[in-house]
Amino acid sequence: MVLDLDLFRVDKGGDPALIRETQEKRFKDPGLVDQLVKADSEWRRCRFRADNLNKLKNLCSKTIGEKMKKKEAVGDDESVPENVLNFDDLTADALAALKVSQIKKVRLLIDEAIQKCDGERVKLEAERFENLREIGNLLHPSVPISNDEDADNKVERIWGDCTVRKKYSHVDLVVMVDGFEGEKGAVVAGSRGYFLKGPLVFLEQALIQYALRTLGSRGYTPIYTPFFMRKEVMQEVAQLSQFDEELYKVIGKGSEKSDDNSYDEKYLIATSEQPIAALHRDEWLRPEDLPIKYAGLSTCFRQEVGSHGRDTRGIFRVHQFEKIEQFVYSSPHDNKSWEMFDEMIATAEEFYQSLGIPYHIVNIVSGSLNHAASKKLDLEAWFPGSGAFRELVSCSNCTDYQARRLRIRYGQTKKMMDKVEFVHMLNATMCATTRTICAILENYQAEKGIAVPEKLREFMPPGLQELIPFVKPAPIDQEPSKKQKKQHEGSKKKAKEVPLENQLQSMEVTEA
């Protein structure tokens, strides 16, 4: 996931000032651009010097061959003249004036210079890449410039009544329909662990089937992805911070051979976007085959580091969940990827409109975008029980930022002489099932249960096609009685703790 290096090179038509400005708008370090330009300039000088040294080495070999052919004297172990040791000014005439033994010494010295130059070049290349991968994509002009997501995300449009309030939040409703086991889930799997059960399993499967059918009717190919990826591939699709804050690492045997003691490092996927992005790694995609549209289905795993204390109850923010994802490879020409961007968010909107879930679309501020996204729109559903908007969908155009690192190229240049182009890559959530279930529960709660959205009824089993009944009391309604019981038990305990002499004094007063 990187920008084109030529964008940093003025002599190649690049504009480092523009990238510096982009970094400032993202509220990231613009100094990375200057560090990269410096490392790249030194790298290019080093490569130029290495190329010249290799030419000199070839010239030495050619000159030796010519002298041997003429049967010139090889010469004794004579020293090399000082003027010849300046390789920047070394000419064919200067070499021709030397003995064969001297030229061989020069060639050895050139070899040493090449090795030194190659070492410097590798070091500079690593330094350049470290800066390059931490510099974000160029921003679309419509992105709001701010570092305050809560205050400055721009609301683009609203659908449905986002003022309605209802009694219960999803935290209570998952318990009331007996579709969730959180305490035992936490014992088995740790923090945010859960068992989804009963009617909510059927509701989740209904959402998956409906989402896949919807995308299938729009030309998307359903694809069920691997749940883990090799480290070297994950490094090409995830930014550095994700390895610490989001991804789970898995260690396993390097192969199926019983005598193989090597170990392989892999990472659980946070979204099917990651393996689908790598699906066409190292390929040339033909213009006539684009756009390529995938409906990714997978379980997703996220550490959620940094969300401590947020949404700790219920199933809205969990470490493991199912998700259907839109993913598209697009042409980089004629604004095609931005047309596809509009189409993808529209598809998500139609899906939630068909489910009758009110929402608004927000344009995410520059400071909250990940490195790859040039622009991101979120669909935030209205949760009438919580009295808040909550994110259900994120739609991003990453332009060629991901494709460049994955080497997914556009077309094929004539005789491979033209500048290589890369496809544009886009992703958008269609349905993260646990979050969508929460939205349905809050919006469709009624006196006796949860009304099933009409579009999902054909996917539900008999007895649950119209209503998911409440079978347990709401935890929030039980909290006052629990609190009173606790206070009563506390009073009894305090009474027992009263010293004996105080009790006797009390009895004497009563008798008097």
UniProtKB/Swiss-Prot annotation:
L-serine binds at T271, R302, E325, N427. Its EC number is 6.1.1.11. Transmembrane segments: none annotated. GO terms for cellular component: cytosol; mitochondrion; nucleus. It comes from the Eukaryota. InterPro entries: aa-tRNA-synt_IIb, aa-tRNA-synth_II, aa-tRNA-synth_II/BPL/LPL, Ser-tRNA-ligase_type_1, Ser-tRNA-synth_1_N, SerRS_1_N_sf, SerRS_core, tRNA-bd_arm. The modification Phosphoserine is found at S241, S506. Gene3D superfamilies: Bira Bifunctional Protein, Domain 2 (3.30.930.10), Serine-tRNA synthetase, tRNA binding domain (1.10.287.40). One of its GO terms (biological process) is tRNA modification. It catalyses: tRNA(Ser) + L-serine + ATP = L-seryl-tRNA(Ser) + AMP + diphosphate + H(+); tRNA(Sec) + L-serine + ATP = L-seryl-tRNA(Sec) + AMP + diphosphate + H(+). Residues 9-61 are annotated as: Interaction with tRNA. Residues 502-512 have a biased composition (Polar residues). The record marks T429 as: Important for serine binding. PANTHER family: SERYL-TRNA SYNTHETASE (PTHR11778). Consists of two distinct domains, a catalytic core and a N-terminal extension that is involved in tRNA binding. This is Serine--tRNA ligase, cytoplasmic. It comes from Mus musculus (Mouse). The lineage of its organism: Eukaryota, Metazoa, Chordata, Craniata, Vertebrata.
